[in-house]
């Protein structure tokens, strides 16, 4: 059973624009990289590079799936401009074609993933589209000639992959605003978890305010999260806030 690994692009990267997205389409790509070792893990490393301008949601190879963005954020993968439907309303999936991999298995894994995403986001099969739809690029180059067969494979792929738990550990205990401000790894863990859910300590600042310090802006991010999730909005992180964060990070 293939595993989905969440390995998100840092929120500070330019290729993680952070625009909210309600996905209406799923866009399929081939990586067009046949080099040995050009698997999902390598592409996960590439897309996190601060100098990379493109971004997409998933990369699939013959043994694993890497997720690079939350599906409620857009990526830059469709080539139809800043406000294009492909970029702003579609989940981007890259299928690896590395020479030392099994492309047919990677394609099968992608079909399972697409089926899963269709169910979770109420996306019909006729909105699973090739990259070519948005920009005219001959992509996914290895699937275009038998696109209908690829779609038929999605319809018959009813066993979705196993998804791993998110890699965002949460601190225990109670954390609140104090003087002097509390600092440490536990604060950093909390800030990263909040940022993944779009409750940034200081969006637009360096690393969106993720600095390991529980100051007023981080307390405000906690308060905003609590307010939006039916908790007492006091800006104090405790067991109830931890439990709610954990449920949202699944």
Swiss-Prot record:
Gene3D superfamilies: Peptidoglycan recognition protein-like, PGBD-like superfamily/PGBD
SMART domains for the chain: Ami_2 (SM00644)
Plastid recorded as keyword: no
Lineage of origin: Bacteria, Bacillati, Bacillota, Bacilli, Bacillales
GO aspect biological process, one term: peptidoglycan turnover
Compartmental location: Secreted
Induction description: Expression is GerE and sigma K-dependent.
Catalytic activity annotation: Hydrolyzes the link between N-acetylmuramoyl residues and L-amino acid residues in certain cell-wall glycopeptides
Keyword annotations: Cell wall biogenesis/degradation, Competence, Hydrolase, Secreted, Signal, Sporulation
Pfam families named in the record: Amidase_2, PG_binding_1
pH dependence as annotated: Optimum pH is 7.0.
Protein name: N-acetylmuramoyl-L-alanine amidase CwlH
Entry similarity comment: Belongs to the N-acetylmuramoyl-L-alanine amidase 2 family.
Statement: the UniProt record of this protein carries the keyword Hydrolase: yes
Entry GO CC: extracellular region
The N-acetylmuramoyl-L-alanine amidase domain, residue ranges: 45-141
Signal peptide span: 1-44
Record InterPro entries: Amidase/PGRP_sf, Amidase_domain, NAMLAA_amidase_2, Peptidoglycan-bd-like, PGBD-like_sf, PGBDSf
The enzyme's E.C. designation: 3.5.1.28
Function per UniProt: Autolysins are involved in some important biological processes such as cell separation, cell-wall turnover, competence for genetic transformation, formation of the flagella and sporulation. Could play a role in mother cell lysis with CwlC.
Source domain of life: Bacteria
GO terms assigned for molecular function: N-acetylmuramoyl-L-alanine amidase activity
């Amino acid at each position: 059973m293939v595993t989905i690994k969440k390995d998100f692009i840092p929120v500070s990267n330019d290729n993680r624009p952070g625009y909210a997205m309600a996905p209406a389409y799923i866009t399929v790509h081939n990586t067009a990289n046949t080099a040995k070792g050009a698997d999902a893990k390598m592409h996960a490393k590439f897309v996190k590079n601060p100098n990379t301008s493109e971004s997409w949601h998933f990369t699939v190879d013959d043994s694993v799936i890497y997720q690079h963005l939350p599906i409620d954020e857009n990526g830059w993968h469709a080539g139809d401009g800043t406000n294009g439907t492909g970029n702003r309303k579609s989940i981007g999936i890259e299928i690896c074609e590395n020479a030392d991999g099994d492309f047919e298995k990677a394609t099968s894994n992608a079909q399972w993933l697409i089926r899963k995403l269709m169910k979770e986001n109420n996306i019909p099969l006729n909105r699973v589209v090739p990259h070519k739809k948005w920009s005219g690029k001959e992509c996914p180059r290895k699937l275009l000639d038998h696109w209908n067969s690829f779609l038929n494979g999605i319809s018959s792929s009813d066993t979705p992959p196993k998804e791993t738990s998110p890699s965002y550990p949460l601190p225990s205990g109670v954390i609140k605003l104090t003087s002097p401000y509390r600092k440490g790894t536990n604060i950093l863990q909390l800030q990263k978890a909040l940022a993944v859910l779009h409750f940034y300590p200081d969006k637009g600042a360096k690393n969106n305010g993720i600095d390991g310090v529980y100051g007023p802006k981080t307390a405000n991010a906690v308060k905003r999260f609590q307010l939006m999730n039916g908790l007492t909005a006091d800006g104090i992180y405790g067991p109830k806030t931890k439990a709610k964060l954990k449920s949202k990070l699944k």
